[in-house]
Amino acid sequence: IYVRPTKDELLYCGEFRELGQPDKKCRC
């Protein structure tokens, strides 16, 4: 089941993407 990430989760996800690290909360 895929849960749409909240705004905070999207920002968190983006920060991890910039660091080049996989995010465990949402798949980027």
UniProtKB/Swiss-Prot annotation:
Gene Ontology terms describing biological process: cell adhesion; regulation of blood coagulation
Q: Give the UniProt keywords, A-Z.
A: Cell adhesion, Secreted
The cellular location(s) given in this protein's UniProt record come to:
Secreted
Q: What is its main location?
A: secreted
Q: Any keyword rRNA-binding? A: no
**Pfam families found in the cross-reference section:** Ornatin
Any single GO CC term annotated in Swiss-Prot or TrEMBL for this entry = extracellular region
Family assignment from sequence similarity: Belongs to the ornatin family.
Its biological purpose is as follows: Potent inhibitor of fibrinogen interaction with platelet receptors expressed on glycoprotein IIb-IIIa complex. May prevent blood from clotting during either feeding and/or storage of ingested blood.
Q: What is the protein named?
A: Ornatin-D
- According to its UniProt entry, this protein's organism is Placobdella ornata
Q: What is the lineage of its organism?
A: Eukaryota, Metazoa, Spiralia, Lophotrochozoa, Annelida
